UniProtKB/Swiss-Prot annotation:
Monomer. Its EC number is 6.3.5.3. It catalyses: N(2)-formyl-N(1)-(5-phospho-beta-D-ribosyl)glycinamide + L-glutamine + ATP + H2O = 2-formamido-N(1)-(5-O-phospho-beta-D-ribosyl)acetamidine + L-glutamate + ADP + phosphate + H(+). Pathway: Purine metabolism; IMP biosynthesis via de novo pathway; 5-amino-1-(5-phospho-D-ribosyl)imidazole from N(2)-formyl-N(1)-(5-phospho-D-ribosyl)glycinamide: step 1/2. This is Phosphoribosylformylglycinamidine synthase. It is found in: Cytoplasm. GO terms for biological process: 'de novo' IMP biosynthetic process. InterPro entries: Class_I_gatase-like (IPR029062), FGAR-AT_N (IPR040707), FGAR-AT_PurM_N-like (IPR055181), PurL_large (IPR010073), PurL_linker (IPR041609), PurM-like_C_dom (IPR010918), PurM-like_C_sf (IPR036676), PurM-like_N_sf (IPR036921). The gene is purL. GO terms for molecular function: ATP binding; metal ion binding; phosphoribosylformylglycinamidine synthase activity. One of its GO terms (cellular component) is cytoplasm.
């Protein structure tokens, strides 16, 4: 039976206005829209009155709901029948954890009530198209129609393909019907294999073969033999990449054989809880570094949010599934798309060349895709610290003559670093009889054929197959699985995981054969033991679907009880679906039909399938010299600053959490004005050291339209000039990931790919001492479509993205582009040796040209000398600022440095040659460094020692004020206000934020950037930052216990425990499942802290599901009530813990006036480094800090204080219960965005009880208790930041 329950409004006023404006633009007479959430409960038994009231209360969340009788025609948008949304999975979990076992499943839709004039059927179709994503949702016209969401179907049996009867044609038909993308020789191979076996193949076997042997999984092109211009080549592409490892194996612990590569890290204190006692402590050991970079291009072109989200999720799983289990740590992301053409902000170079119907626009990708990737990282709890964004779409005269080149098939890059224990780097042995386990969520009928689909050029496969290959994301489930993996590796030698892989393309059909084969075993499996939420799925759908957030593991049979215990505690679903066999054979039994859908020797599936040979021709690039008529420097500057590749990226940065883990030493945002221009990302290796890890990206794809090899060399060079900004030491410490994107088969591209791989793998990297131990390729970067009567295709440039990773000696020695205006000198190190080529630059692009001669690595020895010289200067503390020269050239380098320093520039380019345009806009490799004027001679001497004397040019100095002036020989070349340039640079971000978020907030942020008087972040402390008020109490040796409370989806508990640990507490890991099961109580604890994250993925309101699982469970409710009423206790709730505790008002004495916390005014997750003021309040944790103003990490989507009315707000303030407020950089309490990131009235962001014993706050003090984890800080701070005082106050209070 199905119950229908109304929910809160689904759209804010500005979202409704945006929709109405879209309808008006489409000439649809829609006058009014009202939208609200509707919940559907599928029940297995009726609810009594109390249970019904409980369910209603559970589904009451979000902003307060005014009573409303909807008017107009109903359009009900729900998930597609036959799919289960992540919302449903998490909401159903909450219902069960609150004791509502009669609920089979909860699902949610949005009911749109449309008031409109007379609309034709076609116009109604336009309206429904605007309201839903056809890839993931459907539209019903009555609430009762939602019954279809819960329809159960009978299982369907396996189907066989009549090869023996119909011969080869049967395979050809199956290839088309199932979208297998099999090549002719593979069809021959299968015909031969099954004829020898004397039986017909089943559909599931063919599907499994196609996935396991797709280009996506097998990398056939990279392993192929090559004939170029009739000449046999000595090496495959992959062999040339491996050459870098053979030449420089130093510091690499694992390459080419696992889900990620591993290099040596530092010996540090890894901080985690003991399995037996739950007590957190430091464990001194090597934290080796793993690295991986993936792409998820095809799904992102079809449906950007889930495409990018599952791209990030899959890469995170690769890291976790390295060795015998590892810990993902920090992420990077990248996008290459065609021109944005932002409505009302179209740029002169952006022509509309059309696109295929089935893929979305570049604007849609950049609106939704980054949100999907960020949302996954945020909810999983991994900071996203690095990225790139390029737009390119033009008709150019390249290798194949004049043709369309651009990114209709986008690049969506997802990568990152993690840490792994030394004894877990290598996979273990799989013994015969080992249990084969799937860890993670249930099988769902989604993402079928992603491996094969992404191996085709967009436009080749059937639209329905595209539809089937889109995946869904549930990061909170992946977090639970990762917690299990963490518990396993933390056991050291007792780790129950022998072998682990993630489930990605091809689902279990790819992952399980790979697992057993890599372990030297076969496997026998039971289909019906696989967890599944959809009983009507066929064997093929159960075995081959790409449901995300799953891992496959081999666990020794005697370790299964331990593994089961860990999974139950973390609430991570798992199933034992088979066991390892001696015989190298794969069998899958189906209990329901009592048959064998799969019965194959492993070598048929993974054996010597036909090897590819590429017989290709070289084409010479045409190109045309840059036509300069009509190009003025002033016009060029504005255009280049508007090019998205160059322009400010704030709209891509602030949506992503950059402080979670408490180990982020350098995020994208630089300095007191928080400008996104960092050279590289840096994390600390642990919560107790200054060792660390760095990541940086290099990418120059348009250059490949003129010179394939130069483009690849520049990508390596740029990654190097970016990562050089931190203290690494020997260049051999740097390891690269190479991600290759190409349109294989397009004239000239294959030979170009070979040339580019050779340039990097055989020549440049070995000469520099660099290794590429990991990478990925995507070989179908082309789209085809019909535009009117014309057949069109858009081919991407050959694109190499290099991600550089390194161990860092001291994270405090990371240099940013932030300029200082004291006596200084700016030096350009020009590795282009004065060539100043303008081919394939930003300048050429904004004037719709390609040019003819591009930049290149002019001298490998000088590039190496450059890196060594910068490292020497970093170690000697001689650099005040550093920024590499890249897209936009020297002009953009200087401008970004001036933005970060909020200062003027007085530059002189007289020594850079007579061609001023080329001097300013050439993108040759190099960097601008700022040094003290007194150090200039010594610095130039270091540069000369490294062979760079002829590359160094004095180009002026940074000055206070707002003028940005470039001269040569006394003549002004360019002069403008820095503020004007800053505004131009910000306009792309502003327009994207206006489109995507609340336009009022976007306008306020843009306006703030034009305020030259803004003093930036600043600090005013009312206490001595170096005083440790807890020291006398720590000296007694007594360590009171703090319960570090987490629920499924919480992700900030480790850094919270570390902050309390430093203040003299014993921090104990307490999971809600421990309390609910009665394994742990709160009676032994002095302090309770509820941590940040996304409990239940924030469904049913942020923190509300967590709170209700306490309130609706009598024993646990009593446990909390008793704790809060005990006089000697303290409690702290941060972020998600704050939201949760604000819903426990009925249990917490003196909290009656507390507000609720709801959706931010911007309607967006906000990650900011915000200034707050400590106000006079009873809070015991903030004693002695009143009047202080200091920055703090903020990361939330629902942090806006909601009060009942003005009287409620007045009472809250008059009682003095407000503990922290947001202030602007002038120290004034503010409601203006983004200084107030959520729009809370009067800047309120923390409240306390009348006794001051319980304090809840939205910002994160635990993420910035160490100075080094602050995005910016005054130089005189020591090891501890000012927020450490909160934790020491707690220790002082307990005496």
């Amino acid at each position: 039976m199905m119950e229908i329950l109304r929910g809160s409004p689904a759209l804010s006023a500005f979202r409704i206005n945006k929709l109405l404006a879209r309808f008006q633009a489409a000439r649809l007479p829609v006058h009014n829209i009202y939208a609200e959430y509707v919940h559907f409960a599928d029940l297995n038994a009726p609810l009594n009155d109390d249970e019904h009231a409980q369910l209603e209360r559970l589904l009451k969340y979000g902003p307060a709901l005014a009573s409303h009788a909807p008017q107009g025609k109903l359009l009900l948008v729900t998930p597609r029948p036959g799919t289960i949304s992540p919302w449903s999975s998490k909401a159903t979990d909450i219902a069960h954890n609150c004791g509502l076992q009669q609920v089979n499943r909860l699902e949610r839709g949005v009911a749109y009530y449309i008031e409109a004039g007379t609309l034709t059927n076609e116009q109604w179709q336009q309206v429904t198209a605007e309201l839903h994503d056809r890839m993931m949702e459907t539209v019903f016209f009555a609430l009762d129609d939602a019954e279809q969401l819960f329809a159960h179907h009978q299982p369907t049996p396996v189907t066989s393909v009549d090869l023996l009867g119909q011969g080869r044609q049967a395979l050809i038909d199956a290839n088309l019907r199932l979208g297998l993308a099999l090549a002719e020789d593979e069809i021959d191979y299968l015909q031969d294999a099954f004829t020898k076996l004397g039986r017909n193949p089943n559909d599931i076997e063919l599907y499994m073969f196609a996935q396991a042997n797709s280009e996506h999984c097998r990398h056939k092109i990279f392993n192929a033999d090559w004939i170029i211009d009739g000449e046999q080549q000595p090496k495959s592409l992959f062999k040339m990449i491996k050459n870098t490892f053979e030449t420089t194996p130093d510091h690499v612990l694992s390459a080419y054989k696992d889900n990620a590569a591993v290099m040596e890290g530092s010996e540090v204190g890894r901080y985690f809880a003991d399995h037996e006692t739950g007590r957190y402590d430091f464990h001194q050991e090597p934290a080796h570094i793993l690295m991986k970079v993936e792409t998820h291009n095809h799904p992102t072109a079809i449906s950007p949010w889930p495409g990018a989200a599952t791209g990030s999720g899959g890469e995170i799983r690769d890291e976790g599934a390295t060795g015998r289990g590892a810990k993902p740590k920090a992420g990077l992301v990248g996008f290459s798309v065609s021109n944005l053409r932002i409505p009302g902000f179209e740029q002169p170079w952006e022509e509309d060349f059309g696109k295929p119907e089935r893929i979305v626009t570049a604007l849609d990708i950049m609106t939704e895709g980054p949100l999907g990737g960020a949302a996954f990282n945020n909810e999983f709890g991994r900071p996203a610290l690095n990225g790139y964004f390029r737009t390119y779409e033009e008709k150019v005269n390249s290798h194949n003559g004049e043709e369309l080149r651009g990114y209709h098939k986008p690049i969506m890059l997802a990568g990152g670093i993690g840490n792994i224990r030394a004894d877990h780097v290598q996979k273990g042995e799989i013994n015969v009889g080992a249990k084969l386990v799937v860890l993670g969520g249930p099988a769902m009928n989604i993402g079928l054929g992603g491996g094969a689909a992404s191996s085709m050029a967009s436009g080749q496969s059937d639209a329905d197959l595209d539809f089937a290959s889109v995946q869904r994301d549930n990061p909170e489930m992946e977090r639970r699985c990762q917690e299990v993996i963490d518990r396993c590796w933390q056991l050291g030698d007792a780790n129950p995981i022998l072998f682990i892989h993630d489930v990605g393309a091809g689902g279990l059909s790819n992952a399980m054969p790979e697992l057993v084969s890599d372990g030297g075993r076969g496997g026998k499996f039971e289909l019906r033991d696989i967890l599944s939420d959809e009983p009507g799925m066929s064997p093929l759908e159960i075995w081959c679907n790409e449901s995300q957030e799953r891992y496959v593991l081999a666990v020794a049979a005697d370790q299964l009880p331990l593994f089961d215990e860990l999974c139950k505690r973390e609430r991570a679903p798992y199933a034992v679906i088979g066991e390892a066999t001696e015989e190298l054979h794969l069998s899958l039994h189906d209990r329901h039909f009592d048959n064998q859908p799969i019965d194959l020797p492993l070598d048929v599936l993974l054996g010597k399938t036909p090897k590819m040979t590429r017989d290709v021709q070289t084409l010479k690039a045409k190109g045309d010299a840059l036509a300069r008529e009509g190009i003025t420097i002033a016009d060029a500057v504005k255009r280049v600053l508007h090019l998205p590749t160059v322009a400010e990226k704030t709209f891509l940065v602030t949506i992503g959490d950059r402080s979670v883990t408490g180990m982020v030493a350098r995020d994208q945002m630089v300095g007191p004005w928080q400008v996104p221009v960092a050279n590289c990302a840096v994390t600390t290796a642990s919560l107790d050291s200054y060792y660390g890890e760095a990541m940086a990206i290099g990418e120059r794809a348009p250059v490949a339209l003129l010179d394939f090899a130069a483009s690849a060399r520049l990508a390596v060079g740029e990654a190097l000039t970016n990562i050089a900004a931190t203290q690494i030491g020997d260049i051999k410490r740097i390891k690269l990931s190479a991600n290759w994107m190409a349109a294989a088969g397009h004239p000239g591209e294959d030979a170009g790919l070979y040339e580019a791989v050779k340039a990097v793998g055989e020549e440049l990297c070995p000469a520099l001492g660099l290794t590429i131990p990991v990478g990925k390729d995507s070989m179908s970067m082309k789209t085809r479509w019909q535009e009117g009567n014309e057949e069109r295709e858009m081919t991407s440039p050959l694109s190499l993205v290099i991600s550089a990773f390194a161990r860092v000696e001291d994270v405090r020695h990371t240099i940013t582009p932030q300029l200082s205006t004291e006596d200084n000198a700016l030096l350009l190190i020009d590795l282009g040796k004065g060539n100043n080529a303008l081919g394939a630059t930003a300048l050429a692009q904004v004037y719709r040209q390609l040019g003819d001669k591009p930049a290149d690595v002019r001298d490998v020895a000088q590039l190496k000398g450059f890196y060594d010289a910068i490292q020497a200067l970093v170690a000697q503390r001689k650099l005040l600022a550093y920024h590499d020269r890249s897209d936009g050239g020297l002009l953009v380098t200087l401008a970004e440095m001036a933005f970060a320093g909020h200062c003027g520039i007085d530059a002189d380019i007289a020594t850079l040659g007579d061609d001023r345009l080329a001097a300013l806009f050439s993108e040759e490799l190099g960097a601008v460094i700022q040094v003290r004027a007194a150090d200039r001679e010594a610095v130039e001497a270091v540069l000369a020692q490294h062979g760079l004397a002829d590359c160094v040019h004095y180009v002026g100095q940074a000055v206070s004020g707002d003028r940005f002036v470039i001269t040569a020989n006394g003549q002004t070349v360019f002069s403008e206000s820095r503020t004007t340039l800053r505004v131009w640079w910000a306009e792309t971000t502003w327009q994207m934020q206006r489109l995507r978020d609340n336009p009022e907030c976007a306008d306020q942020e843009h306006q703030a950037k034009s305020n030259d008087a803004d003093p930036g972040l600043n600090v005013k402390l009312s206490f001595d930052i170096n005083e440790d008020v807890a020291a006398p109490f720590i000296a007694t040796g007594a360590r009171p216990k703090v319960a570090v409370l987490r629920e499924q989806g919480v992700n900030s508990h480790v850094e919270m425990a570390a902050a309390f640990h430093r203040a003299g507490f014993d921090a104990i890991d307490v999971h809600m499942s421990d309390l609910l099961a009665g394994r742990t109580g709160l009676e032994g604890f002095h302090v309770l802290v509820a941590c940040g994250g996304f409990s239940y993925g924030d469904v049913l309101g942020a923190g509300e599901g967590w709170a209700k699982s306490i309130l609706f469970n009598d024993r646990v409710r009593d446990e909390f009530a008793t704790f809060f009423h005990r006089p000697q206790t303290l409690a702290l709730g941060v972020c998600n813990g704050c939201q949760m505790m604000s819903n426990l008002r009925e249990l917490i004495p003196g909290s009656e006036l507390w507000p609720r916390f709801v959706r931010n005014t911007s309607d967006r997750f906000e990650a900011r480094f915000s200034l707050v003021e400590v106000t006079q309040s009873p809070s015991l944790l903030l004693q002695g800090m009143v009047g202080s103003q200091m920055p703090i990490a903020v990361s939330h989507g629902e942090g806006r204080v909601e009060v009942r009315d003005a009287a409620h707000l007045a009472a809250l303030e008059s009682k003095g219960l407000v503990a922290l407020r947001y202030v602007d950089n002038f120290g004034k309490v503010t409601e203006t965005y983004p200084a107030n990131p959520n729009g809370s009235p009067n800047g309120i962001t923390a409240v306390t009880t009348e006794s001051g014993r319980v304090t809840i706050m939205m910002p994160h003090p635990e993420r910035v208790f160490r100075t080094v984890s602050n995005s910016w800080h005054p130089e005189n701070w020591g090891e501890d930041g000012p927020w450490m005082r909160i934790f020491r106050n707690a220790r002082k209070q307990l005496g």
